[in-house]
């Protein structure tokens, strides 16, 4: 922002008054200094205010009722209001408007325009094309922009002569000529009403059409009376070969009476039978509603409706909504007075609105670009604009020309609704059919002017005889086709031989290469050994075998691998994006020059091109495979130690390769550390060159690169459209500087900056300040840092060439030349030392992981079974004569689950079974599995323990029952957890079942019986079968057993069972079981009182949590 002339003059006046006051009234020096301080602060106060920009809206608002219907003041106020709310605009200026009246007489209109000089900063208008040139020259002299929607003269588009003139709509003549070209209507007639504004419009239109080489037969003016109109129509009929009649007057659809009488009399004279096409001119200046907008004037006037069949209405295309819908929506939103009827408002309202928005958009662009708001700057920054206007999309091209779309409307002479037939695309100046054909009177279009060539600046005139011209053209075409066909046949044969046959063939297929999929282990030598085996097989004449052992190579296809074997060597395939490549011949003919150039590149530091793979719809560059992979991979491997000597060797290799490419006039365009590969001898080679050239030659599209991919791209290429794909020599030098930063710090580009890749790219695009990586002097010699800064200079012309870089870099190693052999030996020595430490470290890690794995395996399977599975042996099922099984579950678990959240149920089971697992660790038992709330344990297997299995299970059961007596649920501490336990002794068979997640399972009737003992037990009770009690009694260890009586076991009948209630010497407290009813049973769930108490406490806690 700058200090404007008005505030500055006021400050000077204030300073002069202060000086006089100091002289007349003896103003002291201290007081005068205070005045000076105030004077210094005034600009700062002014600095924070937005400058006013007043837009003068010029038109014949008072002398022409049709223009007054456009409601210019309402349109301007609405536009200014919306601009003030649009936060995308620059706020340095605030917009105001003033409605300036234009006299209907052109001479007086120019005089009034001159009087408006001081009333506005820029003008929307004039509406009268008659003084557009004069107004534009005055605007240039006043440095005030002229933004017109009505000016016709194409010379106004010359920005050198009229630098402050802009069109807010496409030139109406361009639109007319585009339509006339399409239908080949060259001969035109122009007629206007007798208002001065339309007379001058007609003269300007005729002159503009003639400048395009189109003959304008008549230019007529007619009054509203029938006699005057009939005279004009007779003159048109007498003129030679007129096809199209352009009517410069107010449209009949919005109440233009002159046009209505003109069309009615033309219909009476049979001139609307298809001989002529009538085109209203004024609708080119606004968007005439047509979707769901029937016109009553056509409905009520049958003669006009029939005549309108010969009229083509060309108007600005509306998109999401019509003018009427947009106006009604604004009225409903309170933006304009609701009392206004949209159908009584001229659609020119939207054009005025769009023109003001146009100025605001240009102003915002100019301020964002250079902070200047001069008239010429606004015109320059009205290019490549796009915004949604009142009800249509407003667009301009790179020259500032409007490219908004138009639509051709038509009726069939019977209906009173307009239909869209063609879209006029002003960007391509072509017509697009919309699916509804034009209904021409008589069923066929108006005859075309076949002898006119529509050449710019050439007069349309007669040519040679059409029949003779057709015969000559046909003969020439036939001869040309014959010669081309023969040449194409010969060339096709030659190309076919060169492409796929012979030792110098370029295109390879699946018959030439064998795809492989290497899996790299921890040792680099594993891949090398396999590669020598493959190469030896290929060289001996045998096909390489792809049934490689695990960890070496596995079969692959072109779809999932980039590595293949070609002529015994490993090769790398750089795949192109999927696309329509055509056949082999079309590829060769369209990009043969690039192919040959890339094939001929031979240098030690350039990865050689071996050919191009093309098969099964895939196209790829085939180059040598480098075993050390890319420079980026080496830099990211912390295990590899790189001293400065070795880093400088890699950089010098890169410089040599790029120097060679630039000498061959070859721009890389994609240079980055991952496109620099290192072979087995630690020689760096540049690869992926020519990729962009082939994309351009084959016209292939590519996905937009990510911000991370653009970190190597020069700023000027980031800012230029298409620059990223094309590249430049200076851009390659910038990319080399970023690679230097990577090598010096062994980090990604801009890794020292605490910004995302997108933020870095945004700063690179929009300097100042110039944004670059910061490299500490400790990473490289000072002269290398200085060279890097020269290479990434903001001005491309200030960057050195690779010849200059090479001359500087080769002497950086303290005056000695870089010796790659010494660097390799030193690096190999470091690598050997690092490898020993790495092996030792990896061995220790492997041993720790092995112990963890074995521990986990023994927790899942018995140790003996786990050892057998580790050795690869089959685990045979094993029978055990006597084992004791333990089953338990939670009483009322279903009720507890229904009253708990799922995570609370998981916490309950985890806490309880963790407690059980701790107990069974002190007993000779084996935990078989847990299913839900069921817990299964066995003793006597997989390791036999004689008769101790019953005692071990009994002791464990007492311990578990004792611990459960004091166990509390975290979420329901008031509710007791009761379990029931069942024990049974008998024979079982054990074995491993399944291959995926193998399990050690028990089988036999003993398992079912033990489960029945648990399910028929009671809470806080250990239910024991007779077989278990018998063994316990033989052990004589003091187990206390009570007879329960005969119990019904499902599937077993009635058997005598017992309760295990204690053991001599067992002092741990056992929970008191619930009393047994008269039927000998208790409830197998929570008591109703317990459930009610828990629900009550839960509701109380919920109320406490919800209380504010």
From Swiss-Prot:
Which stretches make up the Protein kinase domain?
Answer: 532-812
Against Gene3D superfamilies, the record matches this protein to: 3.40.50.2300, Nucleotide cyclase, Transferase(Phosphotransferase) domain 1
Signal sequence, start to end:
1-50
Give the E.C. number(s): 4.6.1.2
Q: Where in the cell is it found?
A: Membrane; Photoreceptor outer segment membrane
Catalysed reactions listed for this entry:
GTP = 3',5'-cyclic GMP + diphosphate
Record's GO cellular component, any one? Answer: rod photoreceptor outer segment
Q: Listed disulfide bonds for this chain?
A: 104-132
| Alphabetical list of InterPro entries matching this protein | A/G_cyclase, A/G_cyclase_CS, ANF_lig-bd_rcpt, Cyclic_nucleotide_synthase, HNOB_dom_associated, Kinase-like_dom_sf, Nucleotide_cyclase, Peripla_BP_I
Subunit organization: Homodimer. Interacts with RD3; promotes the exit of GUCY2F from the endoplasmic reticulum and its trafficking to the photoreceptor outer segments.
Spell out the protein name for this chain. Answer: Retinal guanylyl cyclase 2
**Organism name:** Rattus norvegicus (Rat)
Read off the lineage from the record: Eukaryota, Metazoa, Chordata, Craniata, Vertebrata
* Record gene name: Gucy2f
